[in-house]
Structure formats: structure tokens, C-alpha cells
Amino acid sequence: MLDPARLDNPAVIFDNGSGLCKVGISGEIEPRHVINSVVGHPKFNIPSARSNRKRYFVGEEAQCMYDGLYLHYPIERGLVTRWDDMEKLWKDLFEWELGVKPNEQPVFMTEPSLNPQETREKTTEIMFEKFNVPALYLCNHAVGALCASACITGLVLDSGDGVTCTVPVYEGYSLPHAITKLYVAGRDITEHLTRLLLAKGYTFPCILNKAVVDDIKEKLCTVSLGYKDTEKNCQQFLRKYTLPDGNTIQMSDHLCQVPEVLFTPDHLGIHDLGISKMVCNSIMNCDTDIQENLFAEIVLSGGTTMFPGLQDRLLKELEDLAFEGTPIKITASSDRCYSAWIGGSVMTSMTTFKQMWVTAEDFKEYGAFVVQRKCF
């Protein structure tokens, strides 16, 4: 039988992403640990400080030993595709990163918009059957991000490593019919930058290292105010970058061209709307009574929204797309790469949240389907 006192223990907050997993404890202002969402399986026996023969490695440990490992990424485009590896990742986060016993603390977990029913139920089964958690809650990633901005109604533009989406939220609930997704995000920008660098003749081996190109992207790339001005603007940002091997590359047109694919995915051969039109379309697909409220509370979330200039470019294009005189406000907090996690920390700290949990007794009585009834 469930010990009710366990629901009073601070919850473990998971924000699982295609590129990074963030984990920490309810009530704290930021995640305790942020690790790469990767699991490495040894090609041969590898000694480890944790055990004489470790069967798998996760996060940075896996990436540092990539030569001797088969690397698996359990989350692709926001969705779990390798459940065995996902379970290993969660186990490592519980036991080694946080050092907690999963059967003693409730678990709050973010999930992508339009998460398939079978994925939600599989997550529920693993948490209750494998980890024996006392309670669980699955929360839409965008709802968590909006909560971090102290809002319950607004439009969230979320862009991480694997997917970009626009999610209208009304009084704390996402509106699925108006959600739009674009499968262009941080990973695609990194790959695009890699191709551009190779095409320019920078064929140093470390250019093929994703972590190196990610660093170039995060330190040097910006968004121009308008694509027609890109070439002119790029000349103002000529900068050098020293690679880990000591070689130097000079960034020019790469600097502004790469994030442009968020606004014009046609450049990657993807014939979908860019983020400005996605925002506008999502709002226009909502009831007319709330459209003005959504335009007035647009919240950016995810690491791929961190490019300098993105907020200004988005505002400029939305002013052109929206009806004349429509008030538009875009919130872009400095910690928005963690906003969904922070929202989870805030929500689970509220005394009223206790009634929201799917408890172990709920799972025992109704099965995994109970998550469809209590988490929506």
C-alpha cells in the first residue's frame, strides 16, 4: 500500500530531450544535472570507476569514450525510440546523478506535444513497474515552459535539439488542434553548419565532431533581422574560431546563414512553414476570443531559441503577419533552455498539485491508461 507521506517528499523533475536530459528536485531554481541524452554500449570490456566491468555508459562519460562504444540516442525528434536505453538513462539519473531512491519520491516528467498514447502508457508502466515510484505526472513541455513565465494562457514557441513546435495554451491546457511542428531544430542547424564548413574547405577532422560544431554554433551564430540583409550583416560579424587541434577557421556568411533555416526551412529542402508563420497559424487556428491574448503572451522556450537576434526577427515578421494594431509581446527569459524543467519545479511546489498525481494505487487499480485521464 502507498505510504501517503511519500507524496509529501520533494518530487524528482525530469525534462527529457532529444539532445539533453535535465533532472533535479522540486522547489529548486534550476536542474541539478544536465546530461547528453546518449547511452554507450562497449565494443569490448571497459573498466570503470563505478564497477570492474560496466555494461553501459551515459551522457558525457559515453561521449568521451565514443571510440570504444556503440552510441545510442534513445530519444529521436522528441519521441522515445529505444526504451531499453531510456530506462538505463533514467536509472543512471536516479542513482548516480541525484543519488535518490525512486520508490521514495514522486516523479514529474515533461513530455512532447502530441505525445502518442502508447508512449505515455509505456513511460507510466516503466516508472511504476521498474522503478516503483509512488506517484507520477506527465506534463506537456510547453505548459511547463509557460508556467515558468508565470502564465497560464499564451503561445509557446519551443525549439530544442530535435523538433520545433508552436503550442497554444489556454488556462493551463494545451490546444492540440492548433499545435504545429517543424522537424528542423538544433541538430539540423549543427549538421547544416558542418556541411557549410566542409564546403568552404575546412576539412580538419574535428569539424566532424558534433560537440565542436555545436560550440561554434552557440558562440558565433546569430539571426539577422531580414534574410535579404543577411550577406550585408554577416560582414559585420567576421570572427575567428580556434579549433581544439589549434587550427583556426574564419566565420563569415556561416554566422548568419545557419539559423536562417528556422525561418526558411526551404533552404534544407523542407517545404514547411518557418517559425513566424507557424506562430501565426497556430494562433489563427484558435478561437477568435483568445487570439489577442495569445499574441500578447508569446513565450520562447528551448536552447535553439537562444540565438541573438531571433526574438527581434520573430517580432518583426509577426507584426507583418498579424492584423494591423495587434499587440504582440514576446518573452525570452535568459534561462529558457531550462524553462520546462523550471515550470515543473514550480508546479510541484504548489500545495494544490498533490491532487494531480497519478499514484501507484491508481496504476494498480486502472492500469497505464489512467495517465490519459489524469494527465492532459
From Swiss-Prot:
One of its GO terms (molecular function) is chromatin binding. Disulfide bonds: none annotated. It is found in: Cytoplasm, Cytoskeleton; Cytoplasm; Nucleus; Cytoplasmic vesicle, Secretory vesicle, Acrosome. InterPro entries: Actin, ATPase_NBD. One of its GO terms (cellular component) is cytoskeleton. CDD domains: ASKHA_NBD_actin_Arp-T1-3. Keywords: Cytoplasm, Cytoplasmic vesicle, Cytoskeleton, Nucleus, Transcription, Transcription regulation. One of its GO terms (biological process) is regulation of smoothened signaling pathway. Belongs to the actin family. Negatively regulates the Hedgehog (SHH) signaling. Binds to the promoter of the SHH signaling mediator, GLI1, and inhibits its expression. This is Actin-related protein T1. It comes from Mus musculus.
